[in-house]
């Protein structure tokens, strides 16, 4: 999860988030190189008194600054499209969980089980126990098995919401009347925190998301106790 004064991304705990971090570094390096080149050229123009006689008519330069940006855009677009297809592709999910956004809480339904559903509300600050996180703890966590492909179906009962868990690289809009889906796969166990990422009313800031990723045998034990 995030910590105070953090400037970078949260630690990646899913293959998608790892790919997003690599893509971020790849794109940032291209931006850095272009910015350095532009600043260098500007500094030369400002510090030299010489004038190039062919500046106003240079076919070779015009060809270069037309082709080179196109190549750079392709270098950015191809990895981006690859990640987009990875995020959209879901093959044989081991579990499906339906998530519904409400003002201002989330409800979850494990569609592979009968009568396994619950609402998840934020725990008020006055009810927090020592060590619990303000505005992030919920009364019912979403327990899921780790190292298994999980399909999340996301929608809303009232207004537009957004279901987001940064460390897993997940952010999917919850739109009334529309069912969106995303893939969830965690490499290691733990608690993963998120929040509603779309302004949805006065209590928008009080819609936390808590995922508890556990080994399969612990998940089976939990699901048996909940049914």
UniProtKB/Swiss-Prot annotation:
Its required cofactor(s), as named, are: Cu cation
Instruction: Give binding positions for Mg(2+).
Output: 198
- What name is this protein filed under? Cytochrome c oxidase subunit 2
Cell compartment(s), UniProt: Mitochondrion inner membrane
User: What topology does it adopt in the membrane?
Assistant: Multi-pass membrane protein
What InterPro entries does the record tag this protein with?
CcO_II, CcO_II-like_C, CcO_II_C, Copper_CuA, Cupredoxin, Cyt_c_oxidase_su2, Cyt_c_oxidase_su2_TM_dom, Cyt_c_oxidase_su2_TM_sf
- Enzymatic reactions: 4 Fe(II)-[cytochrome c] + O2 + 8 H(+)(in) = 4 Fe(III)-[cytochrome c] + 2 H2O + 4 H(+)(out)
- What high-level taxonomic lineage is stated for the organism? Eukaryota, Metazoa, Chordata, Craniata, Vertebrata
